[in-house]
Swiss-Prot record:
GO terms for cellular component: acetyl-CoA carboxylase complex; chloroplast stroma. Component of the acetyl coenzyme A carboxylase (ACC) complex. Biotin carboxylase (BC) catalyzes the carboxylation of biotin on its carrier protein (BCCP) and then the CO(2) group is transferred by the transcarboxylase to acetyl-CoA to form malonyl-CoA. The lineage of its organism: Eukaryota, Viridiplantae, Streptophyta, Embryophyta, Tracheophyta. It comes from Cryptomeria japonica. It catalyses: N(6)-carboxybiotinyl-L-lysyl-[protein] + acetyl-CoA = N(6)-biotinyl-L-lysyl-[protein] + malonyl-CoA. Gene3D superfamilies: 2-enoyl-CoA Hydratase, Chain A, domain 1. This is Acetyl-coenzyme A carboxylase carboxyl transferase subunit beta, chloroplastic. Keywords: ATP-binding, Chloroplast, Fatty acid biosynthesis, Fatty acid metabolism, Lipid biosynthesis, Lipid metabolism, Metal-binding, Nucleotide-binding, Plastid, Transferase, Zinc, Zinc-finger. SUPFAM superfamilies: ClpP/crotonase. Acetyl-CoA carboxylase is a heterohexamer composed of biotin carboxyl carrier protein, biotin carboxylase and 2 subunits each of ACCase subunit alpha and ACCase plastid-coded subunit beta (accD). One of its GO terms (biological process) is fatty acid biosynthetic process.
């Protein structure tokens, strides 16, 4: 028995390496499958056969590198613009801000401005204009952050648990207004001083000219004539300089005044929201308890997504009623009803803040002298000494740079005021990045509080219907249809009612693009460069269908545009080999823009410079490529049995309700209708291209 076991073990040891050694995946990249006759073709021999199947004669797809090797003379190819690669141009920006950090930075900057720690650098230094521009840009960023907070989070701030958030936002607006007003005061004072300086110096120039003209001796007059010319030149230079300074200051003044107006509107809007909270507390003291009752009625909802949360829709309904009944003036109620009547219930969270802001803009503004008096009051914001203030600037600067050992770096900055000033400017420049919320935008669902569950268990459904008026039964027919549709949407979206929860995560465009880069070894769906075809220099662009279907995105369009520009400057013939599914839908309108851009460059190349452009259409060439540069060539060449179309067969049949034959979009059929200038087999393509170029260049 022992001998038999040993023999089995030895057989297993001997056979295992052989079985593991043969793995078809290891050799897959060396072979190509002909889809027409299902014959495996060795890739090295495929290139020797010019990409044509030896068994059935079908024209097979080739990569861009293989086509370049097929068309260009050995050793003459030189790639250009190889480092261009796609980015996610439609990526949604992270717009969740840490408002506590925003408040911290805004208070810090107000301390600096009001304390006049860097007054010389901001308002007296010869480079003050740069500092003021950064200050104005900071205020614009602050307003935009508040727009995000008071726009997309409008309904959230109407909840009873938003008091702290509203207080933080009020602090931000308050310090922002004070900073803007202080800067406006200094800018306007500087404008006044510039006008005064201009009047004095202009008078001085005039006095110099008069004294020169009053010279009695002829020789003195001749000497003074050159002096007069010099004075006039200096006077003109001074006027130009003053004009540029005033133009810059007036522009900054206008921008800051606009920022101040927006901050005032946001301040009044926030006060309206705070008033709403007070009214809700007075008229609905048990609001929190009632919301738990509503959650018991609708247990089907898994999270708090505002797009599909019926509870939020219900609260919106209630908030609108509250604002109409209790918020502020009768004029506001009448105005609000007229503005709101055209909106659907689900659209109000999107447009509600715009309506309110439009309303408060019509109200009286703060008077400037009241604002200045308010600024001059000594408050908590101005009570920090310079050492503590500089330390806060240093900490924020190193927080921006993700540096942990900022305490060690503090000493070098406290002794150098210029260093602290530099840190402050960097903080203002990177304000939006510094205040981004580092938390996940959509955090995982938190566990329910035990207190909430205890309260809910003690509630009777009959009591709910009696106490809370907005139940399902009290809704109108249209509202019930809306709720039912949302319930089905929620169940289908979150796979509710099924045994297991299936998580589906969509791959981002950036990851999708990176996967193709790793698979093909190309930065994007085209290779461009310069080479020789039978000794003739040409500019060549070859699209690669293996990379995301050869789709035309921003990078493909840019590389083709730069290739055309290069060919125009160097008077080279241009050849574009097309193999594309059309515009890249992941980039939206950015991909469609490439069609116009390329067509405009081709117009200059062909019409103004009278140069030769040849397009070679291979299978498949569809969509935006067919509609743009694919059909704009002086000579259009197509390969046999190639699929050439604008819209696909299925799209045409669904749109026109007509049956489309498979042959109707094949190059052999289209060539009979004169759609192309020539149909050339791949084996003859190189010679045909060189002969066409020779005829065009030396035909006369």
């Amino acid at each position: 028995m022992c001998e038999e076991n040993e023999n089995k073990d030895s057989e297993y040891i001997e056979t295992t390496p052989v079985e593991n050694g043969y793995n078809s995946e290891r050799f897959k990249h060396l072979w190509f499958l002909c889809e027409n006759c299902e014959t495996l073709i060795y890739k090295k021999s495929l290139l020797e056969q010019k990409g044509v199947c030896a068994e059935c004669g079908a024209t097979l797809q080739m990569t861009s590198s293989e086509r370049i090797e097929l068309l260009i003379d050995n050793g003459t190819w030189r790639s250009i613009n190889t480092k261009l690669s796609s980015i996610d141009v439609l990526e949604k920006k992270h717009t969740t801000f840490d408002i506590k950090m925003v408040r911290k930075v805004s208070i810090l900057l107000y301390k600096v401005i009001s304390g006049k720690y860097f007054y010389k650098e901001f308002f007296k230094n010869k480079y003050y204009n740069k500092a003021l521009r950064i200050l104005v840009a900071y205020n614009n960023t602050l307003v935009n952050i508040l727009k995000v907070a008071l726009g997309s989070k409008f309904i959230k701030y109407l909840n009873l648990d938003s008091k702290e958030t509203i207080k933080i936002l009020q602090d931000i607006i308050d310090t922002g207004l004070k900073t803007a007003q202080f800067a406006l005061f200094e800018i306007r004072k500087k404008i006044k001083n510039e006008f005064y300086r201009f009047a004095l110096l202009n008078k001085a120039f005039e006095n110099k000219q008069i004294s020169s003209l009053l010279a009695q001796n002829l020789e003195d007059r001749r000497d003074d004539e050159s002096e007069i010319i010099s004075i006039e030149f200096d006077r003109m230079a001074f006027r130009v300089q003053t004009f540029l300074i005033l133009e810059s200051l007036l522009k900054l003044n206008t921008q800051l005044a606009d920022v101040k107006e927006q901050l005032l509107s946001q301040d009044k809007f926030l006060k309206a929201v705070a008033t709403s909270l007070v009214k809700k507390e007075l008229y609905f003291p048990e609001d929190k308890r009632k919301t738990r009752k509503i959650k018991k009625i609708f247990p089907f909802y898994p999270g708090t997504d505002p797009e599909t949360d019926y509870f939020l829709w219900l609260r919106t309904h209630m908030a609108i009623s509250l604002m109409e009944r209790y918020l502020v003036l009768k004029e506001f109620k009448y105005w609000f009803r007229n503005r709101y009547c055209g909106l659907l219930e689900e659209e109000f969270p999107r447009f509600g803040s715009d309506i309110l802001i439009e309303y408060v803009k019509k109200q009286d503004r703060y008077e400037s002298y009241n604002m200045i008096d308010h600024i001059m009051q000594d408050d908590l914001h101005t009570s920090t000494n310079s050492v503590e203030l500089f330390q806060q600037i240093n900490l924020l600067f190193h927080h921006k740079n993700n540096e942990k050992d900022c305490d060690n770096n503090f000493l070098s900055y406290t002794e150098n005021t210029k260093g602290i000033y530099f840190c402050l400017l960097e903080i203002m420049k990177q304000f939006s990045t510094l205040t981004l919320d580092s938390k996940d935008k959509f955090p995982k669902k938190k566990g329910r509080d035990t207190k909430d569950t205890e309260d809910i268990e003690d509630i009777d459904e009959e009591d709910i219907e009696e106490e809370y008026p907005l139940t399902y039964d009290s809704l109108t027919k249209e509202e019930k249809e809306y709720v039912d549709a949302n319930i089905e949407l929620i169940k289908s979206t979150f796979n509710l009612g099924k045994e297991e929860f299936i998580e589906t995560e969509e791959q981002s465009y950036q990851d999708y693009n990176t996967s193709y880069q790793k698979e093909t070894g190309l930065p994007d769906a085209i290779q461009t460069g310069v080479g020789e075809i039978n000794g003739i220099s040409v500019a060549l662009g070859v699209m690669d269908f293996q990379f995301m279907g050869g789709s035309m995105g921003s990078v493909v369009g840019e590389k083709i545009t730069r290739l055309i520009q290069f060919a125009t400057e160097n008077f080279l013939p241009l050849i574009l080999v097309c193999a594309s599914g059309g515009a890249r839908m992941q980039e939206g309108s950015f991909s469609l823009m490439q069609m116009n851009k390329i067509a405009a460059m081709l117009h200059t190349y062909q019409k103004e410079k009278n140069l030769l452009y040849i397009s070679v259409l291979t299978s498949p060439t569809t969509g935006g490529v067919t509609a743009s540069f694919g059909m704009l060539a002086n000579v259009t060449i197509v390969e046999p049995n190639a699929y050439i179309a604008f819209a696909g067969k299925r799209v045409i049949e669904q749109t026109l309700n007509q049956i489309v034959d498979d042959e109707d979009q094949i190059s052999d059929s289209l060539f009979d209708f004169g759609m192309f200038d020539s149909m050339v087999p791949r084996a003859l393509l190189k010679n045909v291209l060189s002969e066409t170029i020779e005829i065009y260049m030396y035909g006369d």
